[in-house]
Amino acid sequence: GTPLPIWRSEEGEEICIGSVEELYNEIEKSVAAGFMKSNPLKDQGFVPGNMSQENYDKIDLHRPYVDYIILVSQSGKPMKREADLIDVWFDSGSMPYAQIHYPFENQDAIDKKKAFPADFINEGVDQTRGWFFTLHAIATMIFDSVAFKNVISSGLVLDAKGNKMSKHVGNVVNPFDMIEKYGTDAVRLYMMTNSEPWDNLKFDPEGVDEVRRKFFGTLYNTYSFFALYANVDGFEPGQQQIDFAKRPEIDRWILSCLNTLIKKVTAELENYDPTRAGRLIDAFVNNDLSNWYVRLNRKRFWGKEMSDDKRSAYETLYTCLMTVSRLLAPFAPFYSDQLYRDLGGEKDSVHLDAYPTADEALIDADLEARMEMAQQITSMVLALRRKVNIKVRQPLQSIMIPATAEQKRHIEAVKDLILNEVNVKELNFVEGAGILVKKVKCNFRTMGKKFGKLMKGVAAQMSGLSQEQIADLENKGIPADRKSVV
């Protein structure tokens, strides 16, 4: 522990030392008064005012050495140091100042608030009465200020069944075994995206393996597809770029999604929510980039000549992969760096490059909406085929879709794409909802954020909505005043 820097005489006189230089000078007075034979700081070569690490390495102010120092009071009496030590939480709470040697150096960092209060800190929930408290306590006493602006109090890591890990029970998961088996990035991304950091995490090795296969495997395969054909064609990014406005709609769509992704990920990170940010990247890579864009555009990479259409496909996919490598860097620092360098990034490392910023001019919300409609309808039709065991290769005459006027507009724009994907000849709209019975299924994760403790009451009411009420809800949405729905 840190010795209390207080010396007191038997008569009650005392002095609180505020710096090593002050202690040095007080020892000199004690030597002159005959209470000390010599100044141990001077004997060890310490030079007051020299803030170098080398200078401070010469002395040790821990016990028992500091207890040998006798000071002299103003009345000429000997003073001995108080025997108590400062609680270690005082040391921890002094971190913002001690780490920069304030107030002896770097005064502007604290006084002009360049590095204080901290933007963000993170520790386990057990630190609520420890570090979190002492940081604020000391900052309030000294500066009448909070010590930090944002905090994430991490939950506990439990086993896959939600039980506390225990060596006695035998359910402890060795993190080094997980890293060795699945890789550091897979473990990191799993832990960040599986649950919010402030919630307890049910750690399941199968979940880590799923992240490794479904996310990193998909991203690697997407890069491999690009690299295979790019190397054959001698594609060089940045040469003879196709103007954005002249690119096919599918290219403009994925680039719009990419820039929307940048906006959303940045917003979530600035809001200190890495879980939602990581899930957004995962959804883009798996759903939009791999399962939709690359799958629908494979043939564009197969042509023998480097046509404008083929070059546009290369440029678009390259931009997506390069941007994802930079977006992914905080979540998966190793693979993102590998991907960045494989793509020929300008910097020596992705971590030396700037984090992506969205280009608003490339975002087309209307285009994204109608393509999302195509994805949803395709997914539902294919799911229905699987349910009734009708293979995709077997053509069907028509599909019937209930839709609002706005939805019809979007669907008409991507009608041919949908029909081709699901192998159906006609797409017809259902007028009215007479033949449909709709049910409300609540997304509790989303509702929890919106309604909090009111969520159960809202869910109970929504489960009992009539067909007319459901239609009204679809058209008008949930009221802004959340209490009005309870």
Model-predicted regions and their roles:
Residues A115-Q127:
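A short glycine/serine-rich beta->alpha loop
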Residues H101-K112:
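Cytochrome P450 heme-binding Cys-pocket and its upstream "meander" loop
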